[in-house]
């Protein structure tokens, strides 16, 4: 995949969520929630500050992250669905 996000945006591949409930029931359709975890595939150069300097991002390619769903753009690139979001949408890095 050859894509470079701009500024503070990142490209994330969503990880599949568990399709079974805690009780072992298989969830289908709307009952199965979309995962809010993913792997960072690409990062922009950073956020441009008011003074013109660039603040590097805290995340890097390969990081496993938890993100908020709001203000995310889903795109198909090379046949794979990826998410384009601002670093602001990332809530945590899973270590």
Curated annotation (Swiss-Prot):
InterPro entries: Chaperonin_GroES, Chaperonin_GroES_sf, Chaprnonin_Cpn10_CS, GroES-like_sf. The keyword Chaperone applies. One of its GO terms (cellular component) is cytoplasm. It comes from the Bacteria. Keywords: Chaperone, Cytoplasm. It is found in: Cytoplasm. GO terms for biological process: chaperone cofactor-dependent protein refolding. PANTHER family: 10 KDA HEAT SHOCK PROTEIN (PTHR10772), CO-CHAPERONIN GROES (PTHR10772:SF58). Together with the chaperonin GroEL, plays an essential role in assisting protein folding. The GroEL-GroES system forms a nano-cage that allows encapsulation of the non-native substrate proteins and provides a physical environment optimized to promote and accelerate protein folding. GroES binds to the apical surface of the GroEL ring, thereby capping the opening of the GroEL channel. This is Co-chaperonin GroES. It comes from Aliivibrio salmonicida (strain LFI1238) (Vibrio salmonicida (strain LFI1238)).
